[in-house]
């Protein structure tokens, strides 16, 4: 994990932010317990590299004015057309305090389901967790090939270590396996009924 170099900024206008984005910089805000909001800028390429290695909800090391710290990537805003990062929110991590974050669910075994003429309907792709900063996973893998037609997968089915607590309702549905033919015929019947 590299140390990202944040540059403190004073200018708060949107005109300034657009100018900086054209120059390859991303504006951002840093906040947290006992820290007043701090506006900064960072190189887009440098930030993109770090996000690709830590994930969109990971922990980064950064330095500002020569001091090193850790922060949680709280929010990344992207341009809807170019998908370039246009703003980033960082939350300062104080020591080894427990943090809350969203972690992507990585579904494994989808090709097994499609080979059997079924489809995986994903209801959720993120799970909210609570843990120590050093224990935050980049993603949580979930093998759906164990299920069959009609299977419903819930947050309670996710396998996480004792050090990680799931904050979402454990009865909540994250995915289900449906019959593709049945689903398309139901959609066809709905379209006929609408006409």
Predicted regions and their residues:
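Acidic, negatively charged sequence tracts
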Residues: 1-195
């Amino acid at each position: 994990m590299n140390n990202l170099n944040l540059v403190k900024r004073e200018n708060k206008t949107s005109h300034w932010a657009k100018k900086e984005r054209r120059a390859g910089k991303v504006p951002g805000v840093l906040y947290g317990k006992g820290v007043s909001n701090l506006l900064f800028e960072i190189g887009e390429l440098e930030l993109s590299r770090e996000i690709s290695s830590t994930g969109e909800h990971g922990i980064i090391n950064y330095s500002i004015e020569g001091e090193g710290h850790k922060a949680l990537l709280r929010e990344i805003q992207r341009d809807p057309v170019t998908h370039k990062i246009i703003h980033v929110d960082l939350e300062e991590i104080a020591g080894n305090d427990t943090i809350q974050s969203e972690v992507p669910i990585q579904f494994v075994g989808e090709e097994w389901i499609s080979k059997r003429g079924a489809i995986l309907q994903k209801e959720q792709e993120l799970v909210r967790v609570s843990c120590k900063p050093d224990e935050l996973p980049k993603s949580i893998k979930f093998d759906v090939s164990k299920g069959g037609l009609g299977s419903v997968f819930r947050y309670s089915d996710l396998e996480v270590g004792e050090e990680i607590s799931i904050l979402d309702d454990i009865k909540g549905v994250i995915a289900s396996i449906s019959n593709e033919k049945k689903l398309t015929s139901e959609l066809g019947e709905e379209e006929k009924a609408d006409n």
